[in-house]
Amino acid sequence: MEIFKTCFLMVVLMLLFVFVGGYVGGQQGMIIAFLVALGMNFFSYFFSDKLVLKRYNAVEVSKKNAKGLYAIVRRLSQNAGLPMPKVYIIPERAPNAFATGRNPSHAAVAVTEGLLNLLNENEIEGVLAHELSHVRHYDILTGSIAAVMAGAIAMLANFAKFGAASGSNRNTQKGNAAIMLIIALIMPLAATIIQMAISREREYKADKGAALLTGHPEWLESALNKLENYSNSYTMQNASPQSAHMFIINPFGDIKNTLSTLFRTHPSTSDRIAELKKIGMQLKNR
């Protein structure tokens, strides 16, 4: 299913580029846009993880300089039957975490310094189990490509604005200019919808996977509660909207108002905690 989602995202990206390229530059623009889209798809598949890690200044660590963290990841990976991923720490005081990579053999998990300082060992294990569940379900490739795609859509919106402006200046393509302006306005919404489509359900799925992997859903439950309380006071300083869906909680804080809730990339933390409580009851009744 995740492979299908990944292919779908790549096709959508290509079609968007070709469509906008055709309006801006005709047949030649379509060809150029097609080649650019091919290049971006190739880049997204092989390098999206590196781009995201670099975006957040993540530093790779080993068992020598992060013994406790490394040991938790190794133990969970073995229990999940996964290859050992690379482990990164992000120099950021806001607590958060994400996983990235194109498959379990090329995966990485990253946590912020703030998360390590805020949570106890059991809670950290719950968070890392959540991230490794993303790895096991192949969510990481889809999420990484979606992050690059959201950035590409933002770039396309700028191209569309340029096309609208140039068309209106020539006074010969007013219809095309109007269409391009509409595209420029709806593309940011399209990027958000794409992030929503791949994020909400997979967070519940990863929460459940973490609960089953550790056997202690209360660990992740406690971690999410702390993360939400802290994130509403301290949001990530260099967080990017294009990659917000990758984190275990929204790096911009939990959204409360009704309108914004419709476009949130994460389920509400209270709903996630409620689901974890249900899983906990099911485990006790076995």
Swiss-Prot record:
GO molecular function, one term: metalloendopeptidase activity
GO cellular component: a single term: plasma membrane
Record keywords: Cell inner membrane, Cell membrane, Hydrolase, Membrane, Metal-binding, Metalloprotease, Protease, Transmembrane, Transmembrane helix, Zinc
Keyword Hydrolase: yes
Active site: E131
Pfam family, one: Peptidase_M48
GO process terms (BP): proteolysis
Cofactor note: Binds 1 zinc ion per subunit.
Cofactor entry: Zn(2+)
Binding site for Zn(2+): H130, H134, E203
Annotated TM spans: 6-26, 28-48, 140-160, 178-198
Membrane topology: Multi-pass membrane protein
Subcellular location, principal: membrane
Keyword Protease: yes
EC number: 3.4.24.-
Subcellular location field: Cell inner membrane
NCBIfam families: PRK03001.1
Family of this protein: Belongs to the peptidase M48B family.
HAMAP family assigned to the protein according to its UniProt record, in alphabetical order: Pept_M48_protease_HtpX
Protein name: Protease HtpX homolog
Organism, scientific name: Campylobacter curvus (strain 525.92)
Gene name per UniProt: htpX
